[in-house]
């Protein structure tokens, strides 16, 4: 978590004028996950093996033609790395563009009617540092008639406030009369470990794209609110 000194933050529902900002923040966070995926794929053993073979092939070819110095080898390594990262960025962007499109459908978690079920966290009364959605059980995108957390996003510098947002969502779920709350995430989501720290456990772990070979998964996590201190059933 960040070492930034804690300040007072304001967590509230968005106004009508702020609803478009919710969607924009969520989309930007998904774009960030595409970068996480491209880096994850680059370091996958299979991808590294292909990279190594290509690099050695080019290295030997240039050595035969002109000879290689340490500087030339270093520059060659950088260039080949950049090409391999660029090649994998395109399919990663495409898969998250597809996710964004699905989320913005009338039955998706960012459907127009769902934006009012988000919370925004502001610091110094103006700067938005994070959002979290807590969809009612009957809302589009909710998982099997349970209140469902979606698009929990916090600026990395302000991660120390992340659990304030999550607690707001959990309280909302409890006020809905729920004993179980779900969360929809992807394996590239930087907040996944934070969910695990709060005792969310996976109930769905599925491959949904050919990039799942490299570890991309669609997850649904759940948490029993009756076992959460401070969230006893108040029905």
From Swiss-Prot:
BP term (GO), one: endoplasmic reticulum to Golgi vesicle-mediated transport
Keywords linked to the UniProt accession: Membrane, Transmembrane, Transmembrane helix
Pfam families xref list: Pho86 (PF11124)
Protein's membrane topology: Multi-pass membrane protein
Molecular function terms from GO: L-cysteine-S-conjugate N-acetyltransferase activity
Protein's name according to its UniProt entry: Uncharacterized protein C12B10.02c
GO cellular component annotations of the record: endoplasmic reticulum; endoplasmic reticulum membrane
Subcellular localization(s) per the UniProt record: Membrane
Domain of life: Eukaryota
Transmembrane regions: 41-61, 71-91, 129-149
